[in-house]
Amino acid sequence: MTVMEHTKAASIDLTKHGLRNVKEVVRNPSYEMLFAEETRADLEGYEKGVVTELGAVAVDTGIFTGRSPKDKYIVKDATTEEHMWWTTPAVPNDNKPITQEVWNDLKQLVTNQLSGKRVFVIDGYCGANPDTRLSIRVITEVAWQAHFVKNMFIRPTEEELASFEPDFVVMNGAKCTNQKWKEHGLNSENFTVFNLTERMQLIGGTWYGGEMKKGMFAMMNYFLPLKGIASMHCSANMGKEGDVAIFFGLSGTGKTTLSTDPKRALIGDDEHGWDDDGVFNFEGGCYAKTIKLSKEAEPDIYNAIRRNALLENVTVRNDGSINFDDGSKTENTRVSYPIHHIENIVKPVSKGGHANKVIFLSADAFGVLPPVSKLTPEQTKYHFLSGFTAKLAGTERGITEPTPTFSACFGAAFLTLHPTKYAEVLVKRMEEAGAEAYLVNTGWNGSGKRISIQDTRGIIDAILDGSIEEAPTKHVPIFNLEVPTSLPGVDPTILDPRDTYVDPLQWESKAQDLAQRFINNFAKYTDNAEGQSLVAAGPQLD
């Protein structure tokens, strides 16, 4: 076995991970080498990248253009039995148990796939705080998957690589599938499985890059809250005075777009922790949606798409130009890029102080919620546990139309502990920091159109500069929300959602429908006193 390294780091032994007769290990290659490897003329199928006119390489991920939560499993053993938020028939989630025996079979499959091959190994960190970060090792035979990992995790220095020991290993066997899936009692031949005792993730059958990123997020969501540290599906940025804001929201609600703000420095766009020192990024890159991307509306993200960025599932014309408006492969077109592709970032480490503004983003497909409302501490817990939004087309396999959904903590797919644990840790951090919370609807209203990005940016500006605190307010019934009646730079006719309907009764009937869904969803949290006490903070029907 030869080890080709673009670092001074010591050679690595992959036999301890179960790999045999590996031909060559390419460890932490440079971006130049990855570019050459992923565009090689002899590559075929999903391995082959094409160079676009912007300089970024574009790849296709096949039938999996989003995560496949139905194929996610976790080994149930002494490590996980007590703390893991296991799925139940009454409250289903994505944490489905498998036995050690099934794991052993799947591990054999993946190690067979990667053994005897030339493999890429990327060693990196998940978490900008050295005290709580996970040292991650990803092993793959596909160059662009190594590129994705290099973009998305925190890149170690040569000194750190020399003594690097992984806390968690990801083995990506995208080319292999499990033919014994029925016998194993699994959902399909594809799999994304975790073993917290072995501290390993195995991937088979899916080429989608996000499985590696979100897999490690799920692990941070397990380890950190047990130490009293908030682990959050949010973006974060910092103002010139050092004030920190965090934005919660599911895919497509505007986390990346709204936190990438020329007036503020970006801490990160998707995954963060909040400890005694403040808010810190888990990642070393961004993973932005590119559907309908334009230079005018989102200049920072557009300008980040250059050499070393990696596009997924976009339509590339023969001349190398990109049709960002084409969602024929998927609405979930993406780009990953190292965070330094955004000019205005917090340096040298992606972390800030304690947050003083917490923003919940919802894309309301019903057209009921106000564009912005200020939340009481009880409403904060209620809406955090509810995690309402509309699932937008194509962000998960099998979802094609906007449908309303409730996702606990704005990230139920990535939670590995009970949702109330995250709410408890977040609200404790907010109370200690004196942070205010706001619910922002980036979705639709009675006009049938999506609220414009310009109006939403105006709302965010008013929250961040404090002018929303000076604005006169009115009460919106059913949801019992306080909304401003005017904000600088925001169309005043949209602030009360009832005003966007020709007939206000139409809003009322939709609001009652949505309120009932909130109430039905929240019932699962009312099996204890804390949950029961929050019911009054949610929508009320007479």
UniProtKB/Swiss-Prot annotation:
Identify the pathway.
Answer: Carbohydrate biosynthesis; gluconeogenesis
Q: Which domain of life is it from?
A: Bacteria
What is the reaction catalyzed?
Answer: oxaloacetate + ATP = phosphoenolpyruvate + ADP + CO2
Could you list this entry's UniProt keywords, alphabetically sorted. ATP-binding, Cytoplasm, Decarboxylase, Gluconeogenesis, Lyase, Manganese, Metal-binding, Nucleotide-binding
Q: Name one GO molecular function term.
A: ATP binding
* EC number(s) on file: 4.1.1.49
Q: Where does substrate bind?
A: 67, 208, 214, 334
Q: Which Gene3D superfamilies match?
A: 3.90.228.20, Phosphoenolpyruvate Carboxykinase, domain 1, Phosphoenolpyruvate Carboxykinase, domain 2
Sorted alphabetically, the Gene Ontology BP terms of this entry are: gluconeogenesis
Binding residues for Mn(2+): 214, 233, 270
What does the sequence similarity comment in the record state about its family?
A: Belongs to the phosphoenolpyruvate carboxykinase (ATP) family.
Q: What does this protein do?
A: Involved in the gluconeogenesis. Catalyzes the conversion of oxaloacetate (OAA) to phosphoenolpyruvate (PEP) through direct phosphoryl transfer between the nucleoside triphosphate and OAA.
What protein is this chain from?
Phosphoenolpyruvate carboxykinase (ATP)
- Native organism is Vibrio vulnificus (strain YJ016)
